[in-house]
Amino acid sequence: MVQQHTPPSDLPVRPPSKVLGLLSAGALLLAACAPGDRVAHTEVGTVDFPTSCSAEAQPELERGLALLHHMMYPQAAEAFGEAARIQDDCAMAHWGLAMANFQPFWGSADIEAGRPHAERAVALEPDTERERLYARAALAFFQGEGISYGERVRNWEAAMEALHTTFPDDPEAASLYALAHLSVAPADPGHQERANRIVREIHEAMPEHPGAIHYAIHVHDVEARADDGVSFARAYEDLAPSIPHALHMPSHIYVRLGEWDEVIDWNRRSADAALEHPAGEYISLHYPHALDYLMYGYLQRGEDEKARGILEELRSRDGYEPHLASAYALAAIPARWYVERRDWEGAANLEPGVPESFDWNRFPAGEAMTWFARGLGAARIGDLEGVSEAVDRLETLETALQNRDDYYWAEQTRIQRLSVTAWRSLAEGQVEEAIQEMREAAELAAGMEKHPITPGDLQPAHELLGDLLTEAGRYAEAVEAYERTLATWPQRYHSILGAARAAAEAGQDDVSRRYYEELAELAGDTDRDEVAEARGWIQAN
């Protein structure tokens, strides 16, 4: 059991710091007028991080660590940078500057930017063994050349385990070890459960610890665990009311449960807050990330005009932070607009690489979203040349991701390519081949967990399988495919609709009624044609 942290004997005992950033009126004015992305005036939660650095640097270290736990990396770098400005030989300030260049759960790191700070933290030889282990753990990730990202994360996990084992009552070491352990294998049930035990113990001892709550939500952002994550989602809602990612994180649980009102509410607040916290000269990745969740939620409820507003809002701005989360959202939002509304002509004509100011070459997985939508759209309208172009481009992007050792997104792109290939086969009249290809894609998808940057697939593979089986007249099998989707993604509009239609064709009237009633309840306040269809079927049967 992690108790309230007792600092090492060579440091003064003091209570955990609740990082409120309570500034004088003059300092508040200075912070408001200064450039950059400081968040010193906001509440960011409770951390317990005694160090041997000066009393003047200590509040910045605490705020920086809390922001690391919130995954607000540019803002954390600002705080740690201020600590280093106050005391340049503060090893933990340089540790923090290194860690702000490492985003473990997003699979991202700037090795060249972070390494000098990790090396400096170690070279300064901090006064305590605990701080020396923190510094060495950062260097374990950043040191060396020609090392894959996955190996770096495993090196960091091993170093964090050593730190946690040596100082088991340090909640910061424990929470960061839980993050490291989860980052190594986020889909592994054993890793999930060990991380869960650690963060639950921290949360019991420190209910406002941002890392414990945040990482617990990630632990439960997997199939079959979301129900147990609701308490953490509720705890995070009020912890840091001005931090964009804190406002967003509860929706990782709510999207798993199909609670669209909650998804919409929290991501609207997150998007608005993100505009107040730029990433230097860029619009923070947290803004388009939240908009993608908003778009997804509105479309599942059939609220097309509100969804259109999100697309227009996204396109009204430029200068997005160059990050995979931004790339994904920039591609996914317009793709969702067409695919979720079954506007196949629009999907087939999506333009890749928009906006042009964004560096798409760095993010093949983002570009793949556009080509996936284009391929599906082209297949549905019978444009075989367009389908083949999409398949070829997806194959190129898949290879590029493999060459970068980005195996997760390479596999996701493979699933997209196989799905488009299946629909091409159907368009060519090769029904059995199409079903076989789509089943292969669906089974591959079933073995992969959702990445935290997405609220859900553009169109889940089992839903695509259900659509394809419906087209082939194999209605009972289609119902099974849709129900498999709904077991993972409850309250998905088109899986509910597909199940209702396929069940009706299969003569399963009770099943059809249940799904049509569910659809009418989900989107009953909208003017979508399918809602009228549902009500008409219920009335006639």
Predicted regions and their residues:
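Amphipathic alpha-helical segments of tetratricopeptide repeats
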Residues: 85, 122-123, 204, 234-238, ...
